[in-house]
From Swiss-Prot:
Protein name: Protein RecA
Chief location category: cytoplasm
Superkingdom to which the source organism belongs: Bacteria
Family membership: Belongs to the RecA family.
Gene Ontology CC: one annotated term: cytosol
Keywords from the named record: ATP-binding, Cytoplasm, DNA damage, DNA recombination, DNA repair, DNA-binding, Nucleotide-binding, SOS response
Amino acid sequence: MAIDENKQKALAAALGQIEKQFGKGSIMRLGEDRSMDVETISTGSLSLDIALGAGGLPMGRIVEIYGPESSGKTTLTLQVIAAAQREGKTCAFIDAEHALDPIYAKKLGVDIDNLLCSQPDTGEQALEICDALTRSGAVDVIIVDSVAALTPKAEIEGEIGDSHMGLAARMMSQAMRKLAGNLKNANTLLIFINQIRMKIGVMFGNPETTTGGNALKFYASVRLDIRRIGAVKEGDEVVGSETRVKVVKNKIAAPFKQAEFQILYGEGINSRGELVDLGVKHKMIEKAGAWYSYNGDKIGQGKANACNFLKENPAVAAELDKRLRDLLLHSNGELVAATNEGFDDEAETSEEF
């Protein structure tokens, strides 16, 4: 629809004044000189990258990962760090729980010599460190473990048993307002790990909630609910966890999708097992009885041997990964674009699954 000529001149003058006062790019037309595709970092799980719709977690956004104890929250974030470092990105880990195990992180592929780590004394200090790292523009991924451990200074300095109603929620709300814009400008991914609490007196619906108030729920572009749904066994020995992740909120693609994968103790996400399962499902790997074949060549009898073949032949694993991503993430040759900003918390559910 054509705009009246006088209005057009007035708009051009207003835009010129805004850009002069606040800098170039402070206002622009949505489709002008910018990619609608969101840059992402892999989660280390192919099925979760596919469930997220854009190939991973979005840069320049806030992400929340929550779930019960020992469900794989920290493992998942360490896999994100490992994936980011392989791309040459700088990462920081804000260890508010004072529980990061560098030996375990190294086993998951994290370059601990180049990982920035902070163990802050108070919640305010942790969030100020996040803000300073973001404003530097030099850090690409920041992990905060966890929101529940971000204790306000007043609570630390007070007596045990003192009431500090809403202090943490106010602190988080103020931090979100300050961080959201800076993260976008710096193109920094900020991941908050969160814990689950129970609401008292809930008769109907899900009694579970996350700590730190509601601000994080609104500011997060992606919220992931991670659960342990079973054990991975070799004979009678438990060697890992069957894990399910639900995309509870997603502003970059369609939400409510699920991914299931294995987390092996001491190794992290069983990415090769995912490649075999998805390869068979999408007919890239042929399965005849117990034998698995790829491109006409047998790669192993039984899933474990097929996984070992991919471990010993990383070039084949990389090729299969690329083929699966091209098939499942691309539509008409273009990556899924950020066209789903309309999804918000009104549509959000956090029911247990």
